Amino acid sequence: MKDRLAELQELSRSYDQQFPDGDNDFDAPREDIVFETDNILESLYRVIQDIQDENQLLLIDVRRLGRQNVRFLTSMRRLSSIKRDTNSIAKAIKTRGEGIHQKLRSMKELSEQAEARHGAHSAVARISHAQYSALARAFQQAMYEYNQAEMKQRDNCKIRIQRQLEIMGKDMSGEQIEDMFEQGKWDVFSENLLADLKGARAALNEIESRHRELLRLEGRIRDVHELFLQMAVLVEKQEDTLNVIELNVQKTLDYTGEAKAQVRKAVQYKKKNPCRTICCFCCPCVN
């Protein structure tokens, strides 16, 4: 068989001279195209990042509060210090939660403006809507954990009160304790308390301490009650579309990954086989 390598190399050089820009599409420098929505997306990204950071800090505070509540129930010393720390964390959670809620409302307005200006199917509208739903759900989850921590602390206090009542010889159910808590009739425990019964007196002191803790818990829960209502309305509006958004985001990630893989294969194929196209045209010559 005749060696035709020299001819193929000559044809390759001729082809490069005839189409100088055809083989360098991947390596040629490109100018970035500035779209009208770029500034909006940058502003939106900053808002999203800010809310994400605040949600993370809120979740950290909520879990700190849970640990403080456990310390309050198990520790026998420094109770006043633990109470101060717990109240301080609860106030920080309330303030941060209100700030996140306000930022979510602003983001919602920004999303609606983008949709009205660029259309519901534009990239900026879809991105803002999807991110808003995800951030609102994260905020809801953090506040749900906060509510669970406070309710658990409340139940634990009631259990401790019930145990101390048993020490005093008073057998009461959880419902009876709840009724007495709501009515504020705690003085009935001291009516038959004898001065020489130190155990009963200590039990009464423990009951009064847990009662005060319950009052503080009720106050903290009342403080964030309005925030919980606003959050419920905020998230309820997103429930119908949330699953669809998550599915579309996942599909987009899958398609993007597949497209990147195909592009890499194409680039490698072109670099390794510069003469393959020419060889196809030269097949009749082999015969």
Swiss-Prot record:
GO biological process, one term: natural killer cell mediated cytotoxicity
Keywords, comma-separated and alphabetical: Coiled coil, Golgi apparatus, Membrane, Protein transport, Transport
InterPro entries in UniProt: SNARE, Syntaxin, Syntaxin/epimorphin_CS, Syntaxin11_SNARE, Syntaxin_N, T_SNARE_dom
Domain of life where this protein originates: Eukaryota
Pfam entry (one): Syntaxin
Subcellular localization, as worded in the UniProt entry: Membrane; Golgi apparatus, trans-Golgi network membrane
Gene3D superfamilies: 1.20.5.110, 1.20.58.70
One GO CC term on file: Golgi apparatus
A GO term for molecular function: SNAP receptor activity
Topology in membrane: Peripheral membrane protein
Coiled coil feature spans: 41-71
t-SNARE coiled-coil homology domain mapped to chain residues: 204-266
UniProt function note: SNARE that acts to regulate protein transport between late endosomes and the trans-Golgi network.
Similarity annotation: Belongs to the syntaxin family.
Protein name as catalogued: Syntaxin-11
Species per Swiss-Prot/TrEMBL record: Mus musculus (Mouse)
Gene name of this polypeptide: Stx11
